Each structure stands twice: as C-alpha cells, then as structure tokens.
C-alpha cells in the first residue's frame, strides 16, 4: 500500500508542477515524513533533505490540498503559528481510499455513457465519436478523412465493470 501511495504522490506532484523532478522530490519528502514517524516543520524537512524551504512548502501545501499528508497547526511561545507535517498509515489509507473513490466515479460515468449511446471510431487515428457527431461529419473522420466504423461497447463495458469491481474490493 505504501508503494501505491508513493506513486500517487510522485505522479500528482509531477503532473501539477509539470516536472518529474518535483515528483521525485515530493516522493523523498513523504518517505522522510513516513520513515521518521514524527511531526516535522517544513524548515526541518528542507534541512534534512538539503532543499530550499520554498520548494518544501510548495510541495507540502499541494499535498495537503490533495489530502496526501497530514498537518498540525500550533502556536509557539512567541505567538507564531507553526505547521508540522506528518505521514502515517492512516494518512496513506485515507489517500488511497479517496483516490479509489474518484476512480470509481469516473469509471461509473464512463460505463453510463457507453451504455446510453452508440459510438463510432476512426480506424486510422482512433478518435471516438457519438452517433450525433458521426452523423454531423457524414460518417467521415474530420481529422484524417477515413470512414468511421461502428463499435460494439460490450467488451469495453465488461472491462470497465471488472475494473470497478476490483476497485470496490479496496
């Protein structure tokens, strides 16, 4: 489960910041938080990983927004607000559960759209069109000009249903 969580963290950050390096850096940040089993400030994380505090904060705040790290807020003796970050098994479990829920919703809507209508596919560029779109284009792909072919959705629906059921077991 930890590997799946680390994969989610890495890919989410890499996608958001359009940088695989940031994704790998986020993975290191959460691995550190998980392995240390303690709450750490962003400054402490930056020092331990030898990276800038600004990068650390940016990554941690994005992960917090996604619910991929835990955060605690406390007031120091000099009345400053200090945030400490942590990753534990509960955070990992909840993050994976939330991702599974989102995936199930997307698969469910895809199954619904496939069962409600007929679809046509271009055999050359593999673009998919609804019946209305195919009629509007005269049965010809607007991208490459190839004749569109009707597609039976039964196999796709079966695959999606199996994927939905496997996610349901999580």
Curated annotation (Swiss-Prot):
It holds the Pfam family TFIIE_alpha. SUPFAM superfamilies: Winged helix' DNA-binding domain. SMART domains: TFIIE. InterPro entries: TF_E_archaea, TFIIE/TFIIEa_HTH, TFIIE_asu, TFIIEa/SarR/Rpc3_HTH_dom, WH-like_DNA-bd_sf, WH_DNA-bd_sf. Residues 1-93 form the HTH TFE/IIEalpha-type domain. GO terms for biological process: regulation of DNA-templated transcription; transcription initiation at RNA polymerase II promoter. GO terms for molecular function: DNA binding. It comes from the Archaea. Keywords: DNA-binding, Transcription, Transcription regulation. The winged helix domain is involved in binding to DNA in the preinitiation complex. Monomer. Interaction with RNA polymerase subunits RpoF and RpoE is necessary for Tfe stimulatory transcription activity. Able to interact with Tbp and RNA polymerase in the absence of DNA promoter. Interacts both with the preinitiation and elongation complexes. Transcription factor that plays a role in the activation of archaeal genes transcribed by RNA polymerase. Facilitates transcription initiation by enhancing TATA-box recognition by TATA-box-binding protein (Tbp), and transcription factor B (Tfb) and RNA polymerase recruitment. Not absolutely required for transcription in vitro, but particularly important in cases where Tbp or Tfb function is not optimal. It dynamically alters the nucleic acid-binding properties of RNA polymerases by stabilizing the initiation complex and destabilizing elongation complexes. Belongs to the TFE family. This is Transcription factor E.
């Amino acid at each position: 489960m930890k590997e799946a969580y680390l994969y989610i963290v890495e890919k989410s950050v890499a996608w958001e910041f359009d940088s695989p390096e940031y994704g790998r850096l986020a993975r290191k940040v959460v691995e550190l938080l998980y392995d240390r089993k303690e709450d750490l400030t962003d400054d402490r994380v930056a020092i331990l990983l030898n990276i800038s505090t600004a990068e650390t904060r940016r990554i941690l705040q994005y992960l917090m927004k996604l619910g991929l790290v835990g955060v605690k807020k406390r007031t120091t003796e000099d009345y400053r607000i200090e945030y400490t970050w942590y990753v534990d098994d509960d955070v990992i479990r909840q993050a994976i559960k939330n991702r599974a829920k989102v995936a199930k919703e997307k698969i469910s809507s895809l199954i619904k759209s496939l069962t409600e209508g007929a679809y046509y596919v271009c055999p050359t560029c593999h673009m998919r069109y609804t019946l209305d779109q195919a009629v509007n284009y005269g049965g010809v792909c607007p991208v490459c000009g190839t004749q569109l072919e009707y597609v039976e959705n039964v196999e796709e629906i079966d695959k999606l249903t199996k994927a939905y059921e496997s996610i349901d077991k999580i």
